[in-house]
Amino acid sequence: MNNLFLRHGEVYNPKNIHYSNLPGFSLSTTGNFQAKSIGQKIKKNFEIEKIITSPLLRARQTAQLVNEFLNVKIEISNDIIEWQGPEGWTGKIFNEITNTQAYSKYKSNPLTIDTVKEPLEKVYERVNKLVNENQHCLMVSHQDTIRAYFYFELKEARFNLNKPNHCDVQYIKNGKLKVLSLT
């Protein structure tokens, strides 16, 4: 076992905002439950020496709740922060972005979006750097950040396959993507 990736728990977002890197988006009650539940599963199935988390609140909260079961050091790294997505999405409600051309590209193949501040290849590079510097870590991050890493690392055919759900653990074993989920 090398490193595991954990997507943060469900976020409290009653206005359905594309929050991206906006501060202050915390876990919902369900998200808190998800984090504690997956923490128990991680403890039973893996040897973790440290947790590295995105600096965003929802990821830090997930890391802290999981760590109630692991009791290891927690570090914060910008290398696994949320991908911001297409320009102009952050802070808008989802209904405002779902009819855009960028959203259509995001749903079919986000690699074709040309209005991003950071290409997904660059996301992979920053995450891969962190992965190569660590072993036996749980990295608490975000859906598209995690997906970018595994898509490029495993040279997969389609980006939108295998996106992690809230509190899914993903890792590579024998060259294949493996998932530990709450269900």
Short names for language-model regions:
Residues 7-74:
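Active-site-proximal alpha-helix that buttresses catalytic centers in soluble enzyme cores
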Residues 156-183:
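Domain-level recognition of soluble alpha/beta enzyme cores
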Residues 6, 77-79, 180-182:
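Conserved beta-strand termini and adjacent loop/short-helix elements that scaffold enzyme active sites
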Residues 26, 68-126:
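Phosphate-handling substructures
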Residues 15-18, 63, 86-90, 152:
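Short aromatic-enriched loop/helix-cap "lid" or pocket-rim segments at secondary-structure transitions
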Residues 58-60, 83, 145-147:
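Short, active-site-adjacent cap segments at secondary-structure transitions
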Residues 3, 134-144:
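Generic beta-sheet signal
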Residues 32-39, 120, 124-131:
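Short, amphipathic alpha-helical "lid/cap" segments that border enzyme active or binding sites
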